[in-house]
């Protein structure tokens, strides 16, 4: 990706919303080809296209374990929202279960170097005339990322090692909001802020686990850390190629098992 080194004046020309912090702005890196997208809207529309192609989704259903057969995985044990248990069988199995991948892989004796790293986001509803940034802003000193999504501004940041606790710490979210207001002091939210917390599936080297397992029909697409949305489409294409027995078109040093 192209990146340009800009001084403070050039940063303000690209993003006028930074004028509120111009006295402390030294400069920045600008990636003109960088883009921002709404992951929820994308996946909802993608699910609709998948249904049209014949895909069946089992929502509110948990995979509790995988069953190993003579020639690989023979079934996945599942439990739905009513507590009803069953099995799903297929020719190939793809594990894309984020931070829970390591525990699920252990049911087959597989070891994945994935651990949950907790992060938070704050989403602000914006008025039509809000002085919000039009480009994505990353502030390394404040350790936050700001993205303008339609009529909302989302600010994300922090990294906590709290196991699988995904509860929202309001104090952490309030701190993220304060840091964003230091950069954009003129933003007036059009409503209440929405606080959220999630678990990032991190690997020691920040490289995702993509490829075939030691079982011929089990494949991995997990461990993307903070870059799940960024790498989603490319990773999906790569693992689809691997499952089909093709060499991935995307050259990337995926973690090999």
Residue ranges and their predicted role:
Residues 54-56, 153, 218:
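Short, conserved active-site loop motifs that form the nucleotide-linked donor/cofactor pocket
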Residues 7, 59-61, 194:
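Short loop/edge segments at beta-strand edges and connector loops
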Residues 65-73, 86-216:
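Active-site substrate-recognition segment that forms the wall
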Residues 22-91:
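Helical element adjacent to the flavin cofactor pocket in flavoenzyme catalytic cores
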Residues 14-22:
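A conserved beta-strand/loop capping segment in the N-terminal third of enzymes
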Residues 5, 10, 69-70, 126, ...:
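C-terminal lid/capping helical subdomain adjacent to the catalytic/cofactor pocket in oxidative enzymes
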Residues 1-9, 179-181:
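Dinucleotide-binding Rossmann-like beta1-alpha1 core, especially the glycine-rich loop
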């Amino acid at each position: 990706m192209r990146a340009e080194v800009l001084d403070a004046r050039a940063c303000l020309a690209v993003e006028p919303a930074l004028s509120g912090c111009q006295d402390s702005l030294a400069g920045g890196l600008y990636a003109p080809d960088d883009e921002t997208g709404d992951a929820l809207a994308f996946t909802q529309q993608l699910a609709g296209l998948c249904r049209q192609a014949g895909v069946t989704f089992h929502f509110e259903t948990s995979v509790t374990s995988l069953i190993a057969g003579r020639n690989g995985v023979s079934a996945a044990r599942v439990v739905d929202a009513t507590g009803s248990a069953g099995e799903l069988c297929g020719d190939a199995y793809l594990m894309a279960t984020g931070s829970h991948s390591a525990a699920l892989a252990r049911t087959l004796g597989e070891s994945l170097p994935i651990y949950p790293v907790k992060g938070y986001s704050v989403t602000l509803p914006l008025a039509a005339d809000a002085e919000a940034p039009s480009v994505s802003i990353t502030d390394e000193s404040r350790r936050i990322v700001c993205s303008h999504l339609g009529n909302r501004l989302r600010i994300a940041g922090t990294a906590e090692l709290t196991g699988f606790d995904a509860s929202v710490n309001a104090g952490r979210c309030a701190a993220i909001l304060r840091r964003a207001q230091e950069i954009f002091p003129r933003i007036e939210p059009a409503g209440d802020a929405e606080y959220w917390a999630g678990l990032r599936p991190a690997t020691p080297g920040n490289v995702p686990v993509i490829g075939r397992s030691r079982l011929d029909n089990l494949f991995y697409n997990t461990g993307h850390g903070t870059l799940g949305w960024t790498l989603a489409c490319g990773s999906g294409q790569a693992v689809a190629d691997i499952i089909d027995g093709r060499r991935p078109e995307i050259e990337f040093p995926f973690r090999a098992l």
